[in-house]
Amino acid sequence: MECVNFEKNKQKIALLTDSCADLSAQQREGKPIFVLPLCIRCGQEEYADGETIFARDVYRHLEEGELPKTSLPDGGRLKDILDDIAAQGYEKVLAIHLSAGLSGTYNMVRIQGESRDDLEVAVFDSVSGSLGMGAVVLQAWEDIQGGMSWEELTQKRVPQLIANTFPYFSVDTLEYLLKGGRIGKVTALTGTMLNIKPIVGFAPDGQLASVAKVRGRKAVQGKLVDQLRAKLGSHTRYNLAVANGGAPEEMEQLAQKVKEAFPNYEHFWTGELDATLSVYIGSGMLGACIQFLDE
């Protein structure tokens, strides 16, 4: 077991999230971020998201006509992670999880967290996913390092971050959202032949919802920038993030456009879509997110 240095974390707070936060090993390095993998079943085999199955594997299954099945994380694995957190000397756990409108992960962690006598566990529904959720986790670590108290983190800051983080992403096809039962409030478009691409965000109840649509893939990046600009208003302090699902070169183009449009960001993060969300979104996703830090 590694020796934990609590110099920058005197309250001994660990961060727990799940594989749908899309945080890379590099983004987690040196931080007390623990990741609970969701489960994915392909045929008779079950895999752990981000460990034994990745988005590229899901795309292959989808191309072959097989729709993988997603499921909750393993309860025993969650217990093991919490045991490990306690064994390393942490006393508190700030848990931020995939939207309860898409998954039961939040409730699962909440119930198990309540049963712990050795850890104080505060569990939050991110009402988001991908780097929308990841941005909340990463900014929470910045606040922990800055000395923010546990009470302020749990009672004010994290709820504020969740309410002020806005991810948007393009969906190349609605086929998998429909098949996987996660279509939510996304408008089912019949104009496939018209090359209509929906831009999707999260509704207040955590389900996916249509926010815009464009004609043709080339218009996606500009529309994502427009969505962020429409949200910006009078805010002056913000973080930015972009993500992709099987479209890394286009994400780099999008990153440049987002940075040019909003040059005064405090942090800029990038990510690759996880295997779980890839089951419903398929390949070709582009996403952009803005997170406001002022009230």
Where are each of the predicted segments found?
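A short glycine/small-residue-enriched secondary-structure motif
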Residues: 53-59, 88, 110-115
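Short beta->alpha junction loops
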Residues: 73, 125-127
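N-terminal glycine-rich anion-binding loop in soluble enzyme alpha/beta folds
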Residues: 13-73, 77
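Broad hydrophobic/π-residue packing in well-ordered secondary structure
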Residues: 42, 47, 57-59, 78, ...
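Mixed-charge interfacial surface used for oligomerization/domain docking
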Residues: 3-9, 14, 20-34, 38-39, ...
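Glycine-rich phosphate- or other oxyanion-binding loops that anchor nucleotides, phosphorylated ligands
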Residues: 65-108, 155, 162
